[in-house]
Each structure stands twice: as structure tokens, then as C-alpha cells.
UniProtKB/Swiss-Prot annotation:
Keyword Nucleotide-binding: no
Organism: Enterococcus faecalis (strain ATCC 700802 / V583)
GO-annotated cellular components: cytosolic large ribosomal subunit
Taxonomic lineage of the native organism: Bacteria, Bacillati, Bacillota, Bacilli, Lactobacillales
This protein's record includes keyword RNA-binding: yes
Protein name, per record: Large ribosomal subunit protein uL6
Task performed by this protein: This protein binds to the 23S rRNA, and is important in its secondary structure. It is located near the subunit interface in the base of the L7/L12 stalk, and near the tRNA binding site of the peptidyltransferase center.
């Protein structure tokens, strides 16, 4: 059984936290994140260490305990280091361009696909077949990267499509002729 909720979250230098009822605000060098947490879980701050305490050991409380700690840790890592997801475009003529906060993908459709970055998220295109999504909120970065991948998921026969860097795509054999 996981015991993530019992682990201590160590605050790096330059990260401040503020608690206002159930809302916790984490402020750091990269930005500021606010999130509402369960009122059942109590937060205990000692110096630069934060622990979370649950009222009882019921299964429901254990799940909320671990989730609360993991979400808080993601907020701390996000405002101090940030998160990024890298994608690659594989296919003839597949390319990406960024203009301001708009990403334009040419991935074999009759029209280019445009995506707009939400607030706090940026796109980088180091090469015209690579896209890097960066931001401080792990959930938003992951969801946006998944939406970009969903425009043209990798297909199993030729391997064409948009995939995460390092993602393994299981290949299939084509039909065999007579």
C-alpha cells in the first residue's frame, strides 16, 4: 500500500506558502499557484518542512491524504522548477510553428491545426518536428500535451503521428499478399 501522504514535503529556498481556510497558495520564482484542498486533511508547517495529517485511518481518508500531499508537492515543484513535456512529429511534411502563444501544426490534414496556450503555459519549437510544452501547473501541461498528441496519435503500421519523446509505439505488420 502506498504511504505517499506520510512523506514530508521540503520547501526549497524562495518558495512561500499561505493558507486561507481550505485554499493554499504557493508562491515561488516561476509564479504562483492556488488550489483548494479537503478540509479533513490538516497541514502542519515546521520551518521549511510541510507534513499532512489525516483524522483517521479509513480507506477514504488515506486516499485523500496521499492525493493532497502529491498535489501540494506538484505545486511546490511547479513554482520552483516548472514542468515540461516534449513531443515529436514523425511523418513526411509534418511540422510545427509557434507564433506568440499559438502553436500551428501541419500534420497531414487539408488544414493546419491551431492550438492556443492557456495562461501560464508556453510552447517552444526547437526544431520544426519538436514541440516542448512548459508551465508551472503539472495538470495543465500534461493535458495540453495530451491534446496536441491527440491531433494525430501515432499509428501502428508506419509509426507516423505525434508522440511523446521516448514513447514506444508498438508496430504491426502489414497485410501479406498472395
Amino acid at each position: 500500500m502506498s504511504r505517499i501522504g506520510n512523506k514530508v514535503v521540503v520547501l526549497p529556498a524562495g518558495v512561500e506558502i499561505k493558507q486561507d481556510g481550505n485554499n493554499i497558495t504557493v508562491k515561488g520564482p516561476k509564479g504562483e499557484l492556488t488550489r483548494e484542498f479537503s478540509s479533513d486533511i490538516k497541514m502542519n508547517i515546521e520551518g521549511n518542512e510541510v507534513t499532512f495529517i489525516r483524522p483517521n485511518d479509513s480507506k477514504e481518508m488515506k486516499t485523500i491524504h496521499g492525493t493532497t500531499r502529491a498535489n501540494f508537492n506538484n505545486m511546490v515543484v511547479g513554482v520552483s522548477e516548472g514542468f515540461q513535456k516534449a513531443l515529436e512529429l514523425i511523418g513526411v511534411g509534418y511540422r510545427a510553428q509557434v507564433q506568440g502563444n499559438k502553436l500551428t501544426l501541419n500534420v497531414g490534414y487539408s488544414h493546419p491545426v491551431e492550438m492556443t496556450a492557456p495562461e501560464g503555459v508556453t510552447f517552444e519549437v526547437p526544431a520544426n518536428t519538436q514541440v516542448i510544452v512548459k508551465g508551472i501547473n503539472k495538470e495543465v501541461v500534461g493535458e495540453l500535451a495530451a491534446n496536441i498528441r491527440g491531433v494525430r496519435p501515432p499509428e501502428p503500421y508506419k509509426g507516423k503521428g505525434i508522440r511523446y519523446v521516448g514513447e514506444f509505439v508498438r508496430r504491426k505488420e502489414g497485410k501479406t499478399g498472395k
